[in-house]
A protein has these predicted regions:
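Short glycine-enriched, charge-decorated loop/helix-capping segments at active-site entrances
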Residues: 72-77, 144-150
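Alpha-helical structural signal in soluble globular domains
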Residues: 49-53, 114-122, 189
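Glycine-rich phosphate-binding loop used to anchor ATP phosphates in small-molecule kinases
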Residues: 78-127
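Switch/connector loops and helix/strand junctions flanking conserved nucleotide-binding motifs
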Residues: 67, 135-142, 180-183
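Conserved phosphate-donor/acceptor-positioning beta-strand/loop module used by diverse small-molecule
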Residues: 122-142, 173
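Small-molecule kinase domains that catalyze NTP-dependent phosphoryl transfer to phosphate-bearing small molecules
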Residues: 147-187, 192-198
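Conserved substrate/cofactor phosphate-moiety recognition/catalytic segment
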Residues: 45-98
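Haloarchaeal acidic low-complexity proteome signature biased toward cell-envelope/secretome components but also
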Residues: 1-33, 39-48, 68, 179-198
């Protein structure tokens, strides 16, 4: 699953090539997929579908933040700590041979660069998936969702202003339509529907 047919952004020649050129040659490493995008666009929906493809666990910054901070203030220092912990956990899991999917905004290009460097060095394969969604759909979904995320529509608008453009190879999934349409895009990028064998 390390080579993708549908890639958006940048030069695709080396996209999703896995660890073929990595000097460690650790065939036991697990796959790493990163799902990024603005709050409310449907990252978790996409992450869950990818996890079914790679038979992996999902790590979410929303969960990690609340594990690390009893009363999160979303400061820059807190965000740095959350992403450092996210990447450390992903590194450990991939190195141990477990597939892992990261579900996080990754608005800051520095964090995306850090996780890409780690993934290309440690994981069996690395995929960056950017989730997009029409703004009107995001607003409706945020109004009715009830989950662990604290993000409301004002948070979405804030991140829309500060989200660093993705300049590296990645797959884009448009989650504006029905779930089946979103799943079809993920399946196309990951080689067909996921196995139901478990």
């Amino acid at each position: 699953m390390s080579n993708r047919d549908a890639v958006d952004g940048g030069d695709t020649a080396g996209a999703f090539a896995g660890r073929d050129g990595d000097e460690t040659g650790d065939a036991e490493a697990g796959a790493l997929a990163v799902v990024c995008g603005l709050p409310g666009v449907g990252k978790t929906t996409v992450a869950e579908r990818i996890a079914a493809h790679v038979d992996g666990d999902i790590l979410r910054t929303d969960v990690i933040r609340k594990e690390l901070f009893e009363d999160p203030d979303y400061s820059d220092a807190e965000t740095e700590a959350v992403y450092a912990e996210l990447i450390d956990r992903a590194r450990e899991r991939a190195a141990d041979g477990d597939a892992v999917v990261l579900d996080a905004t990754f608005a800051d290009a520095r964090f995306r660069a850090d996780v890409r460097e780690m993934g290309e060095r440690v994981a069996d394969s690395f995929d960056l998936v950017a989730v997009e969604c029409d703004e009107s759909v995001v607003e409706r979904r945020i109004e009715r969702r009830d989950g662990i995320s604290d993000a409301d529509f004002d948070v979405y608008l804030h991140f829309k202003d500060v989200f660093d453009r993705i300049e590296t190879d990645h797959v884009t999934v448009d989650n504006s339509g029905e779930e089946a349409e979103t799943f079809a895009q993920v399946d196309a990028a990951f080689g067909g529907p996921p196995s139901l064998d478990g």
